[in-house]
Regions:
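Short amphipathic alpha-helix used as the core "switch/output" element in two-component signaling
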Residues: 43, 65-76
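Alpha4 helix (beta4-alpha4-beta5 surface) of REC/receiver domains from two-component response regulators
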Residues: 66, 87-102, 115, 119
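Charged docking surfaces used in two-component/phosphorelay signaling
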Residues: 19-27
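Acidic catalytic/metal-coordinating carboxylates
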Residues: 36-40, 62-66
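Receiver (REC) domain active-site loop signature in two-component systems and cognate sites
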Residues: 59
Length: 134
C-alpha cells in the first residue's frame, strides 16, 4: 500500500465490541486508537487528530452526542460514524444535524462497517463537504 496509513478513533464502552472493531480495522490496514467513554475520546481527538471517529451513542461519563457537539466546534473535525443500538429516528436526525456521515445500527456486520469507513475516508480525501453555495 502506498497510501498513508489512516488513523481511526473508536469510542465504545463495550470492550468486546471495541476489541472486535479494533481487530477488524487493524487487519484492514488502519491505525486504531480506542477510548471507552466520550471524555477519553475528546482527549484523543485533541491529541492525536484521527482521520475518522467511530463513536457509540450511549456511554457512561460522556456519550456520543457531547462528542459530536464538541467536534462541531472544531474547524478541522474528522468525519464521524455513529454506532448505536438505539432505534429512535430523532436521535438519528440529531446526529445527522451534527454532521455524522453514517449511522450504523447495532448489531452490524463488520463488512458493512468497513465499507462505511472506506466511504467516509474517501469522501474526506476528496475535499471539503461544505462548499460555499452560490
Amino acid at each position: 500500500m502506498t497510501q498513508t496509513q489512516k488513523t481511526i478513533l473508536v469510542i465504545e464502552d463495550d470492550r468486546d465490541i471495541s476489541s472486535t472493531i479494533q481487530s477488524v480495522l487493524s487487519a484492514a490496514g488502519y491505525r486504531v486508537l480506542t477510548a471507552h467513554n466520550g471524555q477519553d475520546g475528546r482527549r484523543l481527538i485533541q491529541g492525536q487528530k484521527p482521520d475518522l471517529v467511530l463513536t457509540d451513542m450511549m456511554m457512561p461519563r460522556m456519550g456520543g452526542f457531547p462528542v459530536l457537539e464538541f467536534l462541531a466546534e472544531l474547524p478541522d473535525a474528522p468525519p464521524v460514524i455513529m454506532m448505536t443500538a438505539n432505534e429512535g429516528s430523532r436521535h438519528k436526525a440529531y446526529a445527522e444535524m451534527l454532521g455524522v456521515v453514517d449511522y450504523l445500527r447495532k448489531p452490524f456486520a463488520m463488512e458493512v462497517m468497513l465499507e462505511s469507513v472506506a466511504r467516509a475516508i474517501a469522501a474526506a480525501a476528496a475535499g471539503p463537504k461544505d462548499q460555499p453555495e452560490a
